[in-house]
């Protein structure tokens, strides 16, 4: 596990972009795994501004809210189109289908996509409770793409994106921890003091399902990029 501490979110995002650009330019990255939320927004803005050619790169996404259509402004389809896909050309882009009513079939479909498009670099954020994707504490390390019940803390953290608290979905489709760990390389981004405890447990704590991100200690190629605040408890 390589640890990089930077001055702020912009510097950390640029460092992540350097790694991604190098992989794409060298031809080593055919599939790029993407995350959502506030953490990668600056990375995507920098990627849009960059000259790197992504026309031959396929993207996959970690998760999507259950019950939200792709054109819903709160869906991750909308988020990705708004911040990245409408501004940068990719070969193909895949996300779970939030409108799928057969959860088992949807999860199997998405695992099939991941099998066809093995992830070369997976970008991750981390929740204040140590979740990666929407894999909440207690999730099996052997989990594949699954339908998850969102914890109160996760819904609380995400309510700022919604007009009303009751509009925050209660479930999501998420790549499982095993699905994430199958990526050849992982870049974990964390910015802000509110992520410091989760980062401490991820890097310094035991590998334990109560901190899902701690499983990254077992991955052969992980780069953790932090700002000074997120690194403050290390």
Curated annotation (Swiss-Prot):
PANTHER family in the record: GLUCOSAMINE-6-PHOSPHATE ISOMERASE
Coiled coil: none
GO molecular function, one term: glucosamine-6-phosphate deaminase activity
Protein role: Catalyzes the reversible isomerization-deamination of glucosamine 6-phosphate (GlcN6P) to form fructose 6-phosphate (Fru6P) and ammonium ion.
Family that this chain belongs to: Belongs to the glucosamine/galactosamine-6-phosphate isomerase family. NagB subfamily.
Organism: Listeria innocua serovar 6a (strain ATCC BAA-680 / CLIP 11262)
The protein's annotated pathway: Amino-sugar metabolism; N-acetylneuraminate degradation; D-fructose 6-phosphate from N-acetylneuraminate: step 5/5
EC number per UniProt: 3.5.99.6
Active site: 63 (proton acceptor), 129 (for ring-opening step), 131 (proton acceptor), 136 (for ring-opening step)
Name of the protein in question: Glucosamine-6-phosphate deaminase
Group of enzyme by EC: hydrolase
InterPro entries for the chain: Glc/Gal-6P_isomerase, Glucosamine6P_isomerase, Glucosamine6P_isomerase_CS, NagB/RpiA_transferase-like
Superkingdom of origin: Bacteria
Reaction(s) catalysed by this chain's protein: alpha-D-glucosamine 6-phosphate + H2O = beta-D-fructose 6-phosphate + NH4(+)
Keyword vocabulary terms for this entry: Carbohydrate metabolism, Hydrolase
GO CC, one annotated term: cytoplasm
GO annotation (BP), single: glucosamine catabolic process
Name of the encoding gene: nagB
Pfam families, alphabetized: Glucosamine_iso
């Amino acid at each position: 596990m390589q640890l990089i501490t930077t001055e702020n979110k912009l510097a950390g995002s640029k460092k992540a972009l350097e790694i991604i650009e190098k992989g794409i330019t060298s031809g080593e990255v055919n599939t790029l795994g993407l995350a959502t939320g506030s953490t990668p927004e600056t990375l995507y803005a920098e990627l849009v501004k960059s000259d790197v050619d992504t026309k031959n790169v396929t993207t996959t996404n970690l998760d999507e809210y259950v019950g939200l259509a792709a054109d819903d402004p709160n869906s991750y389809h909308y988020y990705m189109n708004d911040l990245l896909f409408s501004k940068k050309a990719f070969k193909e882009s895949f996300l779970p289908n939030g409108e799928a009513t057969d959860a088992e079939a949807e999860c199997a479909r998405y695992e099939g996509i991941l099998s066809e498009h093995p992830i070369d670099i997976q970008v991750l954020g981390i929740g204040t409770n140590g979740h990666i994707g929407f894999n909440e504490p207690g999730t099996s390390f052997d989990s594949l793409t699954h339908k998850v019940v969102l914890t109160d803390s996760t819904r609380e953290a995400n309510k700022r994106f919604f007009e009303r608290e009751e509009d925050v979905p209660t479930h999501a489709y998420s790549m499982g921890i095993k699905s994430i760990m199958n990526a050849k390389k992982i870049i974990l981004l964390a910015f802000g003091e509110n992520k410091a405890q989760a980062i401490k447990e991820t890097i310094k704590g035991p590998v334990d399902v109560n901190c899902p991100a701690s499983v990254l200690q077992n991955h052969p190629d992980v780069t953790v990029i932090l700002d000074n605040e997120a690194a403050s408890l290390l």
